[in-house]
């Protein structure tokens, strides 16, 4: 159960909030409050995923804050700061064919239709209008994630994304 490959990071704990053991939650879900859909939170601590029991979680205008069982005070909950929040991959909703969670694209190789290797996807950057693949290789490439326009094919089995993009961009 603690095999790291079965886990998806959905957020990260921030700093303590107030004096009663609340902690800020930085959600990696889109929209941010989708993190509330997952009940079975775990934290990677002491080289393994450990379950957390949420006592309270609140969405405020500028933050999500949570109170975790076993962390009743500011000093105790500060130990969670900067730790990742994970859920088992099986908790994620099934996607339609051709749709992907961003974590599935991270680490894939990127080539163009000529077979030129750009590098690997290291990050996906939201820009407002469309997301952008950040590809690191001999140089850094920023490629708009627009399936059918710039993203031609995603081969999950080979872990390769084919793009219509020039190496000189």
From Swiss-Prot:
The keyword rRNA processing applies. GO terms for biological process: ribosomal small subunit biogenesis; rRNA processing. Pfam families: PRC_RimM, RimM. Residues 97-169 form the PRC barrel domain. One of its GO terms (cellular component) is cytoplasm. It is found in: Cytoplasm. GO terms for molecular function: ribosome binding. InterPro entries: PRC_barrel-like_sf, PRC_RimM, RimM, RimM_N, RimM_N_sf, Transl_B-barrel_sf. The keyword Cell cycle does not apply. Keywords: Chaperone, Cytoplasm, Ribosome biogenesis, rRNA processing. Belongs to the RimM family. The PRC barrel domain binds ribosomal protein uS19. An accessory protein needed during the final step in the assembly of 30S ribosomal subunit, possibly for assembly of the head region. Essential for efficient processing of 16S rRNA. May be needed both before and after RbfA during the maturation of 16S rRNA. It has affinity for free ribosomal 30S subunits but not for 70S ribosomes. Binds ribosomal protein uS19. NCBIfam families: 16S_RimM. This is Ribosome maturation factor RimM.
């Amino acid at each position: 159960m603690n095999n790291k490959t079965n886990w998806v990071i959905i957020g990260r704990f921030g700093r303590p909030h107030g004096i009663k053991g609340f902690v800020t939650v930085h959600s990696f879900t889109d929209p941010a409050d989708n993190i509330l859909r997952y009940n079975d939170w775990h934290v990677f601590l002491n080289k393994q995923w450990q379950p957390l029991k949420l006592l309270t979680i609140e969405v405020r205008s500028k933050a999500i804050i949570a109170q975790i069982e076993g962390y009743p005070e500011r000093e105790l909950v500060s130990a969670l700061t900067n730790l990742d929040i994970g859920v088992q991959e099986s908790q994620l909703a099934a996607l339609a064919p051709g749709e992907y969670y961003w974590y599935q694209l991270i680490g894939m190789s990127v080539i163009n239709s000529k077979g030129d290797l750009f590098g690997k996807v290291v990050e996906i950057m939201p820009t407002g209008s469309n997301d952008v693949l950040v590809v690191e290789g001999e140089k850094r490439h920023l490629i708009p994630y627009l399936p059918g326009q710039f993203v031609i094919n995603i081969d999950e089995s080979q872990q390769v994304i084919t793009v219509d993009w020039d190496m000189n961009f």
